[in-house]
Amino acid sequence: MVEFAFDIKHLFPQSIIRVQAHSLRPKVTQCRRYAQTERGKSTMTSCRLSEILNIMGKLSADAQGLCHAVTSADKLASDQVVYLMADKAAGHWEITGLLKVGTKDLFVFDQGGCYRRLNQTPAILDFYVHESRQRCGQGKLLFEWMLEKQGWSAHKCTVDRPSNKMLAFMAKHYGLVRTIPQGNNFVLYEGFFDDPITTCKSASGLQATGSGCRSRSQGHYVRQEQDQAQIKHGQANRNTVQNDANSGPFRQDQKIVVGTSIYRRRWKSPRTLARAGCREVSGGRRF
Protein backbone atom coordinates (compact mmCIF):
# COMPACT_ATOMS: atom_id res chain seq x y z
CA MET A 1 0.00 0.00 0.00
CA VAL A 2 1.07 3.56 -0.68
CA GLU A 3 1.03 6.08 2.14
CA PHE A 4 1.10 9.85 1.75
CA ALA A 5 2.10 12.65 4.09
CA PHE A 6 -1.42 14.06 3.98
CA ASP A 7 -4.74 12.53 4.90
CA ILE A 8 -6.61 11.17 1.88
CA LYS A 9 -9.82 10.25 3.68
CA HIS A 10 -11.75 13.26 2.39
CA LEU A 11 -10.68 12.40 -1.18
CA PHE A 12 -12.38 9.00 -1.07
CA PRO A 13 -16.09 9.13 -0.26
CA GLN A 14 -15.99 5.51 -1.43
CA SER A 15 -13.24 2.96 -1.99
CA ILE A 16 -12.90 3.76 -5.72
CA ILE A 17 -12.98 7.26 -7.18
CA ARG A 18 -12.93 8.57 -10.72
CA VAL A 19 -10.37 11.24 -11.67
CA GLN A 20 -10.44 13.27 -14.89
CA ALA A 21 -8.28 16.03 -16.30
CA HIS A 22 -10.63 18.89 -15.37
CA SER A 23 -10.41 17.94 -11.69
CA LEU A 24 -6.63 18.43 -11.81
CA ARG A 25 -6.76 22.01 -13.09
CA PRO A 26 -7.67 24.30 -10.18
CA LYS A 27 -8.94 27.80 -10.71
CA VAL A 28 -7.52 30.90 -9.02
CA THR A 29 -10.73 31.42 -7.05
CA GLN A 30 -10.43 27.91 -5.65
CA CYS A 31 -6.93 28.57 -4.39
CA ARG A 32 -8.23 31.31 -2.08
CA ARG A 33 -10.83 29.09 -0.47
CA TYR A 34 -8.43 26.60 0.99
CA ALA A 35 -6.49 27.25 4.13
CA GLN A 36 -2.80 26.50 4.57
CA THR A 37 -1.56 23.44 6.44
CA GLU A 38 0.94 23.60 9.27
CA ARG A 39 3.69 23.08 6.66
CA GLY A 40 2.52 26.06 4.65
CA LYS A 41 1.40 23.95 1.71
CA SER A 42 -1.92 24.25 -0.04
CA THR A 43 -4.53 21.66 0.85
CA MET A 44 -6.23 21.84 -2.52
CA THR A 45 -7.85 18.61 -3.59
CA SER A 46 -6.56 18.90 -7.13
CA CYS A 47 -2.96 19.26 -5.97
CA ARG A 48 -3.23 16.17 -3.82
CA LEU A 49 -4.84 14.16 -6.59
CA SER A 50 -2.06 15.23 -8.93
CA GLU A 51 0.55 14.06 -6.45
CA ILE A 52 -1.23 10.72 -6.03
CA LEU A 53 -1.37 10.20 -9.79
CA ASN A 54 2.30 11.01 -10.23
CA ILE A 55 3.44 8.64 -7.48
CA MET A 56 1.15 5.79 -8.53
CA GLY A 57 2.14 6.23 -12.16
CA LYS A 58 5.80 5.97 -11.18
CA LEU A 59 5.16 2.79 -9.19
CA SER A 60 3.26 1.29 -12.11
CA ALA A 61 6.12 2.05 -14.49
CA ASP A 62 8.66 0.50 -12.11
CA ALA A 63 6.55 -2.64 -11.74
CA GLN A 64 6.36 -3.02 -15.54
CA GLY A 65 10.00 -2.17 -16.14
CA LEU A 66 9.23 1.00 -18.10
CA CYS A 67 11.62 3.93 -18.37
CA HIS A 68 8.86 6.54 -18.28
CA ALA A 69 5.56 6.64 -16.44
CA VAL A 70 2.42 6.16 -18.52
CA THR A 71 0.22 7.92 -15.98
CA SER A 72 0.84 11.39 -14.62
CA ALA A 73 -1.20 14.48 -13.92
CA ASP A 74 0.38 16.38 -16.80
CA LYS A 75 -0.23 13.61 -19.36
CA LEU A 76 -3.87 12.99 -18.49
CA ALA A 77 -5.95 13.92 -21.54
CA SER A 78 -9.54 15.13 -21.55
CA ASP A 79 -10.82 11.81 -22.95
CA GLN A 80 -9.00 9.71 -20.35
CA VAL A 81 -10.13 8.58 -16.91
CA VAL A 82 -8.13 7.28 -13.96
CA TYR A 83 -9.76 5.08 -11.33
CA LEU A 84 -8.03 5.13 -7.94
CA MET A 85 -8.64 2.50 -5.29
CA ALA A 86 -8.00 2.92 -1.57
CA ASP A 87 -8.79 1.05 1.64
CA LYS A 88 -8.26 1.45 5.38
CA ALA A 89 -7.22 -2.05 6.28
CA ALA A 90 -4.27 -0.65 8.24
CA GLY A 91 -6.50 1.72 10.20
CA HIS A 92 -6.10 4.67 7.86
CA TRP A 93 -6.76 5.22 4.17
CA GLU A 94 -4.04 4.13 1.76
CA ILE A 95 -3.90 3.93 -2.05
CA THR A 96 -3.90 0.36 -3.34
CA GLY A 97 -4.53 0.52 -7.10
CA LEU A 98 -4.72 2.56 -10.29
CA LEU A 99 -6.49 1.96 -13.59
CA LYS A 100 -6.18 4.38 -16.50
CA VAL A 101 -8.52 4.06 -19.49
CA GLY A 102 -9.50 6.10 -22.52
CA THR A 103 -10.53 5.91 -26.15
CA LYS A 104 -8.27 5.63 -29.18
CA ASP A 105 -8.66 5.96 -32.95
CA LEU A 106 -6.88 2.88 -34.29
CA PHE A 107 -6.11 1.13 -37.56
CA VAL A 108 -6.41 -2.59 -36.86
CA PHE A 109 -6.79 -5.97 -38.56
CA ASP A 110 -9.82 -8.16 -37.96
CA GLN A 111 -9.84 -11.95 -37.88
CA GLY A 112 -10.15 -12.12 -41.66
CA GLY A 113 -7.11 -9.91 -42.19
CA CYS A 114 -9.11 -6.87 -43.30
CA TYR A 115 -7.74 -3.46 -42.45
CA ARG A 116 -10.18 -1.37 -40.44
CA ARG A 117 -10.33 2.04 -38.85
CA LEU A 118 -11.86 2.10 -35.38
CA ASN A 119 -12.95 5.38 -33.85
CA GLN A 120 -13.30 5.92 -30.10
CA THR A 121 -12.13 2.41 -29.28
CA PRO A 122 -12.12 1.47 -25.56
CA ALA A 123 -8.51 1.13 -24.43
CA ILE A 124 -6.80 -0.01 -21.23
CA LEU A 125 -3.79 2.28 -20.88
CA ASP A 126 -2.35 1.55 -17.42
CA PHE A 127 -3.23 -0.93 -14.67
CA TYR A 128 -1.46 -1.33 -11.35
CA VAL A 129 -2.33 -2.90 -8.01
CA HIS A 130 0.10 -2.68 -5.13
CA GLU A 131 2.03 -5.87 -4.46
CA SER A 132 0.50 -6.22 -1.00
CA ARG A 133 -3.00 -6.30 -2.52
CA GLN A 134 -2.40 -8.58 -5.49
CA ARG A 135 -4.11 -12.00 -5.66
CA CYS A 136 -6.72 -10.75 -3.22
CA GLY A 137 -9.47 -9.85 -5.67
CA GLN A 138 -8.67 -6.13 -5.54
CA GLY A 139 -7.65 -5.96 -9.20
CA LYS A 140 -10.82 -7.71 -10.33
CA LEU A 141 -12.92 -5.37 -8.18
CA LEU A 142 -11.25 -2.30 -9.67
CA PHE A 143 -11.57 -3.60 -13.23
CA GLU A 144 -15.24 -4.53 -12.82
CA TRP A 145 -15.98 -1.10 -11.35
CA MET A 146 -14.40 0.53 -14.37
CA LEU A 147 -16.35 -1.62 -16.85
CA GLU A 148 -19.62 -0.74 -15.14
CA LYS A 149 -18.93 3.01 -15.05
CA GLN A 150 -17.66 3.13 -18.63
CA GLY A 151 -20.35 0.83 -20.00
CA TRP A 152 -17.75 -1.46 -21.58
CA SER A 153 -17.22 -5.20 -21.76
CA ALA A 154 -13.86 -6.88 -21.33
CA HIS A 155 -13.66 -8.51 -24.77
CA LYS A 156 -14.39 -5.15 -26.44
CA CYS A 157 -11.40 -3.45 -24.82
CA THR A 158 -8.02 -3.02 -26.44
CA VAL A 159 -4.93 -3.15 -24.24
CA ASP A 160 -1.93 -0.91 -24.82
CA ARG A 161 1.41 -2.72 -24.36
CA PRO A 162 0.09 -5.32 -21.91
CA SER A 163 2.52 -6.89 -19.47
CA ASN A 164 2.61 -10.61 -18.79
CA LYS A 165 0.64 -10.02 -15.59
CA MET A 166 -2.01 -8.12 -17.52
CA LEU A 167 -2.35 -10.91 -20.08
CA ALA A 168 -2.64 -13.46 -17.26
CA PHE A 169 -5.27 -11.28 -15.55
CA MET A 170 -7.45 -11.12 -18.67
CA ALA A 171 -7.10 -14.86 -19.21
CA LYS A 172 -7.92 -15.78 -15.62
CA HIS A 173 -10.91 -13.54 -14.99
CA TYR A 174 -12.43 -13.18 -18.46
CA GLY A 175 -11.19 -16.21 -20.38
CA LEU A 176 -9.52 -13.99 -22.99
CA VAL A 177 -6.52 -15.87 -24.33
CA ARG A 178 -6.49 -15.82 -28.11
CA THR A 179 -5.54 -12.48 -29.63
CA ILE A 180 -5.80 -10.99 -33.13
CA PRO A 181 -2.32 -10.11 -34.45
CA GLN A 182 -1.84 -6.39 -34.99
CA GLY A 183 0.78 -4.13 -36.47
CA ASN A 184 0.79 -1.77 -33.47
CA ASN A 185 1.26 -2.10 -29.71
CA PHE A 186 -2.42 -2.71 -28.95
CA VAL A 187 -3.81 -6.17 -28.22
CA LEU A 188 -7.27 -7.19 -29.45
CA TYR A 189 -8.94 -10.40 -28.35
CA GLU A 190 -10.96 -12.74 -30.50
CA GLY A 191 -14.62 -11.79 -30.35
CA PHE A 192 -13.90 -8.08 -30.64
CA PHE A 193 -15.55 -7.94 -34.09
CA ASP A 194 -18.37 -10.41 -33.40
CA ASP A 195 -20.85 -7.73 -32.35
CA PRO A 196 -22.41 -5.87 -35.32
CA ILE A 197 -21.86 -2.64 -33.40
CA THR A 198 -18.14 -2.90 -34.10
CA THR A 199 -18.66 -3.00 -37.88
CA CYS A 200 -16.34 -0.19 -38.83
CA LYS A 201 -15.12 1.60 -41.90
CA SER A 202 -11.90 0.82 -43.67
CA ALA A 203 -9.08 3.29 -44.12
CA SER A 204 -10.45 4.37 -47.50
CA GLY A 205 -13.82 5.25 -45.98
CA LEU A 206 -15.59 2.21 -47.49
CA GLN A 207 -17.13 -0.65 -45.60
CA ALA A 208 -14.35 -3.09 -44.76
CA THR A 209 -15.77 -6.25 -46.28
CA GLY A 210 -13.24 -7.16 -48.93
CA SER A 211 -11.22 -4.06 -49.67
CA GLY A 212 -8.05 -3.51 -47.72
CA CYS A 213 -7.48 -7.18 -46.93
CA ARG A 214 -4.10 -8.55 -46.04
CA SER A 215 -2.49 -11.30 -48.13
CA ARG A 216 -1.05 -13.77 -45.63
CA SER A 217 1.13 -15.52 -48.22
CA GLN A 218 2.76 -12.39 -49.61
CA GLY A 219 2.78 -10.28 -46.46
CA HIS A 220 1.28 -7.16 -47.99
CA TYR A 221 -2.14 -5.64 -48.60
CA VAL A 222 -4.20 -6.57 -51.61
CA ARG A 223 -6.99 -4.28 -52.73
CA GLN A 224 -9.14 -7.04 -54.13
CA GLU A 225 -12.14 -5.00 -55.17
CA GLN A 226 -10.02 -2.33 -56.80
CA ASP A 227 -7.95 -4.89 -58.68
CA GLN A 228 -11.04 -6.64 -59.97
CA ALA A 229 -12.51 -3.34 -61.09
CA GLN A 230 -9.30 -2.43 -62.91
CA ILE A 231 -9.18 -5.82 -64.63
CA LYS A 232 -12.77 -5.48 -65.82
CA HIS A 233 -12.11 -1.93 -66.98
CA GLY A 234 -9.03 -3.07 -68.91
CA GLN A 235 -10.92 -5.91 -70.57
CA ALA A 236 -13.67 -3.51 -71.62
CA ASN A 237 -11.13 -1.15 -73.19
CA ARG A 238 -9.47 -3.98 -75.12
CA ASN A 239 -12.81 -5.21 -76.39
CA THR A 240 -13.63 -1.69 -77.58
CA VAL A 241 -10.33 -1.44 -79.42
CA GLN A 242 -10.80 -4.82 -81.08
CA ASN A 243 -14.35 -4.05 -82.15
CA ASP A 244 -13.35 -0.69 -83.62
CA ALA A 245 -10.41 -2.24 -85.44
CA ASN A 246 -12.38 -5.11 -86.94
CA SER A 247 -15.35 -3.00 -87.97
CA GLY A 248 -13.36 -0.36 -89.91
CA PRO A 249 -11.88 -0.56 -93.41
CA PHE A 250 -8.52 -1.65 -91.96
CA ARG A 251 -7.80 -4.77 -89.91
CA GLN A 252 -5.72 -5.30 -86.77
CA ASP A 253 -2.53 -5.83 -88.76
CA GLN A 254 -2.51 -2.08 -89.49
CA LYS A 255 -2.10 -1.02 -85.86
CA ILE A 256 -1.04 2.52 -86.55
CA VAL A 257 -4.33 3.33 -88.25
CA VAL A 258 -6.32 1.88 -85.36
CA GLY A 259 -4.31 3.85 -82.84
CA THR A 260 -4.79 7.04 -84.81
CA SER A 261 -8.55 6.59 -85.19
CA ILE A 262 -9.07 5.88 -81.50
CA TYR A 263 -6.93 8.54 -79.89
CA ARG A 264 -7.25 11.07 -82.79
CA ARG A 265 -3.55 11.80 -82.88
CA ARG A 266 -0.53 10.37 -84.64
CA TRP A 267 2.41 8.81 -82.88
CA LYS A 268 5.36 10.90 -83.98
CA SER A 269 7.90 10.18 -81.26
CA PRO A 270 10.46 7.53 -82.30
CA ARG A 271 10.73 6.45 -78.69
CA THR A 272 7.00 5.82 -78.55
CA LEU A 273 7.16 3.88 -81.81
CA ALA A 274 9.95 1.71 -80.51
CA ARG A 275 8.10 1.02 -77.28
CA ALA A 276 4.89 0.09 -79.07
CA GLY A 277 6.69 -2.11 -81.61
CA CYS A 278 5.26 -0.16 -84.52
CA ARG A 279 6.70 1.36 -87.67
CA GLU A 280 5.30 4.41 -89.33
CA VAL A 281 5.51 4.86 -93.07
CA SER A 282 5.68 8.48 -94.21
CA GLY A 283 6.65 9.72 -97.66
CA GLY A 284 7.97 6.33 -98.75
CA ARG A 285 10.65 6.31 -96.00
CA ARG A 286 10.92 4.08 -92.92
CA PHE A 287 11.88 5.46 -89.54
Swiss-Prot record:
It is an enzyme of class 2 (transferase). Keywords: Acyltransferase, Transferase. GO terms for molecular function: tubulin N-acetyltransferase activity. GO terms for biological process: microtubule cytoskeleton organization; neuron development; regulation of microtubule cytoskeleton organization. It is found in: Midbody, Midbody ring. In the ovaries of mutant flies lacking expression of this protein the plasma membrane barrier between germline cells and surrounding somatic follicular cells is compromised, allowing cytoplasmic material to leak from one cell into the other, thus the name leaky. This is Alpha-tubulin N-acetyltransferase 2. It comes from Drosophila melanogaster (Fruit fly). The gene is lky.
